[in-house]
Regions:
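Exposed beta-strand/loop interface patches that mediate assembly or binding
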Residues: 1-117, 195-196
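Short, glycine-/Ser/Thr-/acidic-enriched flexible segments
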Residues: 73, 116, 125, 134, ...
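Intrinsic-disorder/coil detector with helix-boundary
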Residues: 2-4, 19, 130-196
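Conserved, well-structured core segments that form or line functional sites
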Residues: 108-110, 116-119, 128, 135, ...
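Fold-independent oxyanion-binding glycine-rich loops
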Residues: 24, 83, 114, 123, ...
Length: 196
């Protein structure tokens, strides 16, 4: 075989290489990949879901399978496309109407558009939502909401103690808090007037 033919064969063979992650440089956003037979690449970029005005970050895992796509068959110029199911991670679901992220700690993000249900599950920890100065914080043992104004519409059921730390408590515009007063207070069995 001539040198030219051998070079062409090598370049064609190097266009798309099945491989797995051998190293990750998080600060630089680069990975090294290997073919499992002794070859390891130079540091190359990996593909993300988005890298424009909207950007996505998920670092490939060590051992994660994917393919190295190399222009002109030069692996040093390649980019790694992660996400082939294999030894490092099996498929997390098998339903066509579900998008799922499952994480090593047991957490998951699941959207089932057939059931119209979005589920966020953490084994423990914190979920924080921040919009401007308003926030909601969910932990293992408490839910805390903070905003200039909170409006609840609909029937409300509270099972447990209620503690109110505020300057006023009103019902239908009438003060029923700790500073409310009653008129018509007379000794004896008579009833008081409504709160003022």
């Amino acid at each position: 075989m001539s040198y030219v033919s051998a070079t062409h064969d090598r370049m064609i063979a190097g266009l798309i290489l099945p491989c797995r992650v051998a190293g990750v440089d998080l600060a630089a956003g680069l990975v090294r990949v290997c073919d499992g037979a002794g070859w390891t690449s130079a540091w190359v970029r990996w593909h993300s879901q988005a890298a424009g005005k909207a950007r996505h970050w998920r670092a490939p895992s060590l051992g994660e399978q994917g393919v190295l796509i190399s222009p002109s068959g030069e692996p040093a110029q390649g980019t790694f496309v992660p996400g082939l199911y294999g030894d490092a991670g099996a498929q997390p679901d098998n339903r066509e109407h579900v998008e799922v992220w499952r994480f090593d700690d047991g957490g998951s993000l699941v959207y089932d558009w057939q059931a119209k249900r979005y589920s966020i599950s953490l084994p423990s920890g914190t979920v924080a939502i921040q919009v401007g100065a308003s926030s909601a914080l969910v932990t293992d043992s408490a839910i805390t909401g903070k905003a200039d104004s909170i409006t609840l519409t609909g029937a409300i059921t509270l099972n447990g103690d209620v503690q109110i730390n505020g300057a006023s408590l009103k019902h239908n515009g009438v003060n029923v808090g700790s500073t409310h007063v009653h008129l018509g207070v007379l000794p004896g069995p008579g009833a008081t007037a409504p709160p003022q």
